[in-house]
Regions:
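Nucleotidyltransferase catalytic core that binds NTPs
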Residues: 1-212
Length: 212
């Protein structure tokens, strides 16, 4: 029987509680045997802003998932050159697992709605399932997806409501810069790592990053 593997790709700059909620709810709802967290080495959709060093993002993700045995960290995108396209990553995972796994790409509805802009999206959708995570009560419009992907949209894209989706990495970085607390937004180990390394502060700002 094939294993069911979830893929949590992202910049994780930083990883936060919503990432963990999404991964765990997806694992439970779709009976996933494992969820792979894959920090993007060179994300194609983040070319317009500076991204924190991969080593920091990788280590923060490692700290975030340490308490869950079903979560695994992968550096598969660091090991290759070029932009971190999801299709290339999925194909590499298929080679690693051979024919022994079905993959479920976990992402937010904003990304699902922009799926037609991704690198070779039809090939990607044919290669793995997608779990589109929505906020509680948010409507799901499948008309555009069916227009772009036809039958594949019905067969390959699933939807899952998850609470706590209001947390964002962008807001956490802002809060650190402004000296506001980020406790309960990120795991304690990640909070301490950000403080220790002085991440997300303006250049030359050596003050304590946040109050807790």
């Amino acid at each position: 029987m094939k294993r069911r593997i979830g893929i949590m790709g992202g910049t994780f700059d930083p990883p936060h509680m919503a990432h963990l909620l999404i991964a765990e709810n997806s694992r439970a709802a779709f009976s996933l045997d494992e969820v792979l967290f894959i920090p993007a080495a060179d994300p194609p959709h983040k070319q317009d802003r500076a991204v924190t060093l991969y080593a920091h993002r990788y280590h923060m993700t490692e700290l975030s998932i340490a308490a869950n045995d079903a979560f695994t960290l992968s550096d598969i995108e660091r090991k290759r050159s070029g932009l971190s396209y999801s299709l290339v990553t999925v194909r590499e995972l298929q080679k690693l697992y051979r024919a022994g796994a079905d993959f479920y790409f976990i992402t937010g509805m904003d990304s699902i709605n922009d799926l037609h802009k991704w690198y070779h999206p039809k090939e990607l959708l044919a290669s793995c399932h997608f779990i589109g995570v929505t906020r509680l009560g948010d409507p799901v419009n499948t008309i555009a997806l069916e227009k772009d992907f036809g039958k594949l949209a019905c067969e390959r894209i699933y939807f899952l409501e998850v609470p706590g989706m209001e947390i964002s990495s962008t807001d956490i970085r802002r809060r650190v810069r402004e000296g506001l607390p980020i406790r309960y937004l990120v795991p304690d180990a990640v909070k301490e790592y950000i403080r220790k390394e002085g991440l997300y502060l303006d250049k030359g700002d050596k003050r304590n990053a946040f109050s807790g």
